[in-house]
Structures are given as structure tokens and as C-alpha cells.
Amino acid sequence: MTPIVERVSEDRVGVLSSQPSTKRSYSRGLLVWNRLPWRSIATIASVLMAWEALSLSGAIDPSRFPSPEQTFRATVAMIERPFAGHTLFGHIGASLVRWILGVALAIAVGITFGAAMAWNLTFRAATRPIFEFLRYIPPLAWVPLAIIVLGPSLSAEVFIVFVGAVPPVIINVWTGVAGVDPVLTSAAKTLGAGSLRTLLLIALPAATLNILTGIRVAVANGWASLIGAELVGAQSGLGFIIITAQTSNRADDILTGMLFIGLIGALTDVVLRTTTRRLTFWYGSSL
């Protein structure tokens, strides 16, 4: 075979070998494209366009309810310059720290307490009346007491998040562990596992879906509780942005705070829902 023929053959092989790679890349890109929530994107875009159109037409008074453009400008200004002592991301960071600490504490206490209530009848009988009483007190009702006892501090804000987040964790862990198939626990004990070992290695893993569901609800409750607490007892955070903007009659800054409260909550729920679906894939795709 001549050098020219060999070179042509090599070029053909290279072209043929690159075709599957190109097809795979195209298929992967198409899959990502199809997975995008186009209906949600279209709905959000439609709402924004209608909102802007109503503002431009005068149907909505921009001085009372700002347009999307005004809200965007207020957001950019808050990112670039401090608002009430912090930039926008400084306020977001303050809220996230309180939220994470409170929810983490609620998860640790909730799993321990809920598992104990499901596993030990004596403990359940002693603690259930108190728990049932306390869980019906709204988290915001604790704010004045928390400020008096703990002062306007990080501890008070974390406590409010904890109060709002811990009940769903306890309830879901309790019902999940109590609902584990008795055959599984009996088999473990027959093989020599003690009560604590059976709880840790059999009952809690079997209640994974309930636990993750409780955590997902706790995260949402904790976020809502925190924002409420920041409205009355904080010097930073997204809730503090809203109440400060209200005193200065700045509706665009209020909407900026509300926008990021909703965005952070929604994105967190998407992450938790995806994590739950992947960790409990055997339950199907309805999660």
C-alpha cells in the first residue's frame, strides 16, 4: 500500500472512530436539554413579562409595587453597596449560618428522640404528652421569650430555627422506626444482635425514607421560622432586610429580600428531593 493510500485509510478510520463520540456527546446534550424544567421556566417568564407589562401600562403603580426592572436594580445596588451594614451576600450568609446550625441541631436531636420514642415504650409514655403539647406552639411565639432569655443573639435565632425544625424530624423518625417490619428486627435479635444494635443497623436504615422526608420538612420549617425571627430580633439576614426596607418605605428592597428567600428555599428543596430520590430509588419515581 502506498503512503497516500495509507494516509487516506487512516483518515477514514479517524473519521469513523470519531462518529460514535460525536453521537454520544449529542445524545448527552439532548438528554440534559430534555431534563430542563421548561414548563416552569415558561411560567416564570410569563409572570415576569405580565408584571413588567402591567407596570409599564400604569395598571400597577411602580411607586407602591416596583416593576421587575426596579427590583433588579435594587438587587444589583444591594450586591454592590452595603445595606444596613452588610451587602446582600453578607445578609444571605448570616441567614444561612443560623439556618444550618439550627437545622443540624434539630436533625441530631430529632433522630435521637424519635428513635427513642419508637423503641422504648417507657420513654414514649413519659415524653409524648410534653412533646404533643410543645409541638403545637408556633415557632414565632417563642421569639419574645428567646430574646428575653438569650438576648438578641445567634443563640436565640438558632433556637427559633431548632424549635421550628425538630417536630417533623421526631414524628417521621418515630413513625418510620415504629413501622419497620417486625420480622426484620426479630431475625436480627435471633442472630444475637442486642436492642441498640438492632435499632442502629436494622430499624433506622429501614426507616430511611421517613427520616429523609422529616429532614426535608424540617429544612423548610426551619427556614420559615428563621425569616420570621429575623423580622423582629436580628441585626442582619434576609428577614432583617425586609423589616428595615419596610421602615424606609422601600418596596423594591423588600422584594429583593423576598426573592432570595424564595430562591434559597426552592433550590434547597430541589437538592433534598433529588437526594431522597437517589437514596431511596426502590420506592419508585413518585418522590
Question: PLM features: what roles do these ranges have?
Answer:
Residues 28-29, 57-104:
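Periplasmic/extracellular loop-to-transmembrane helix junction in inner-membrane transport proteins
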Residues 56, 115, 122-129, 172, ...:
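Membrane-spanning helices that line or support transport/gating and their immediate boundary helices
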Residues 132-168, 175-176:
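Generic hydrophobic transmembrane alpha-helix motif, especially the helices
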Residues 101-131:
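Transmembrane-helix boundary motif in ABC transporter permease subunits
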Residues 159, 163, 195-229, 252, ...:
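Transmembrane alpha-helices
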Residues 148, 177, 224-261, 280-287:
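Glycine-rich helix-loop "coupling/hinge" segments at transmembrane-helix boundaries
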Residues 1-45, 270-287:
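Transmembrane alpha-helical segments of polytopic membrane transport and secretion proteins
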Residues 169-214, 238, 242:
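Short cytoplasmic-facing helical segments at TM-TM junctions of multi-pass membrane proteins
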